[in-house]
Structure formats: C-alpha cells, structure tokens
A protein has these predicted regions:
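Mature, folded catalytic cores of secreted/periplasmic enzymes
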Residues: 1, 71-72
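N-terminal carbohydrate-binding accessory modules
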Residues: 1-9, 19-24
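Hydrophobic faces of well-ordered beta-strands that scaffold small-molecule active sites
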Residues: 8-14, 39-43, 81-85
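The substrate-binding groove and active-site-proximal loops of carbohydrate-active enzymes
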Residues: 10-21, 52-64, 117-133
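Aromatic-lined carbohydrate-binding/catalytic grooves of carbohydrate-active enzymes
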Residues: 29-68, 89-92, 99-102
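Helix C-cap/helix->beta junction micro-motif
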Residues: 73-77
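Active-site-adjacent "subsite" loops/lids of carbohydrate-active enzymes
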Residues: 88-133
C-alpha cells in the first residue's frame, strides 16, 4: 500500500510496549482514525517489541503476531502502518535508565560514566558511539 499523493498525509503516532494494549489500539484505528480519514499510523516500538532473535533485549510484550493484527486492521481501512524502531544509538528513555541492550553491553555506552538515575541536564538519553568499537 502506498499513501496517495493527491491526499495530504494525515498520520497518528503512538508508542506501544504492552501486548494488552493491542486490541484497544485496533479499536482506536477502526472506530476513530479510519472514520476521520487518517491514512498513516506510525507505531513506535522502542524496547516494546519482543524480538524473535534476541528477546532478552526487549522490555515489552508486543509480538510479531500483534504487529500483523495491527497492520491488517490498518490496511482494511486504507491506512499505511509505519513501524518505528529505534536504532542502536537510541537505547534508553529520556532521562531514564538504559534499555536491556546497554545493560548487557555497557561497553557500547558513550555515556557510561553517568549513574542509572542521572537526570536532565546531566543526561538526555544514553547513546552509542560507533567509535567505541
């Protein structure tokens, strides 16, 4: 599916991390977003997606099957589902502790000198620097 160029981009962005929210999100798509002519849904997963290859690097409970259900609901209504997964250099919440990847591999941290409970302005987000390799 492709967003039609003759229609403006009307998108909804949300962050999901819990399997129990999937049915409510599908209800939102079908009962509210579709009738309001939304044509894109950006689903930010961050550590909420349970990776099949490395499930230990996830905090959430969203599964592949959950994403398939969301995508099917979107497509039934002409909405383009757009997944958003953070890259390796963004592996923490704003002013929060590092996500599981950095907990298991602190050698990747560019900001390893900071304590887990550091807050703004001492810490914005944990980051990884390719030069740490």
């Amino acid at each position: 599916m492709e967003i039609k160029k003759d229609k403006p981009f009307v998108g909804f962005h949300t962050r999901l991390s819990d399997h129990t929210a999937v049915d409510k999100f599908i209800e939102l798509i079908e009962e509210h977003l579709a009738p309001m002519d939304f044509n894109a849904v950006i689903v930010e997963l961050n550590p909420g997606y349970t990776y099949r290859c490395f499930p230990e690097y996830s905090n959430g409970t969203i599964t592949y099957e959950d994403l398939q259900k969301i995508a099917a609901a979107c497509r039934r209504h002409g909405i383009e589902p757009i997944p958003l997964i953070q890259c390796l250099s963004h592996q923490s919440d704003f002013s929060g502790g590092p996500w599981p990847l950095y907990k298991d591999h602190p050698e990747f941290l560019e900001t390893e000198r900071l304590p887990d409970d550091a807050e703004w302005p001492d810490l914005y987000v944990y980051s990884w620097c390719a030069s740490n390799d």
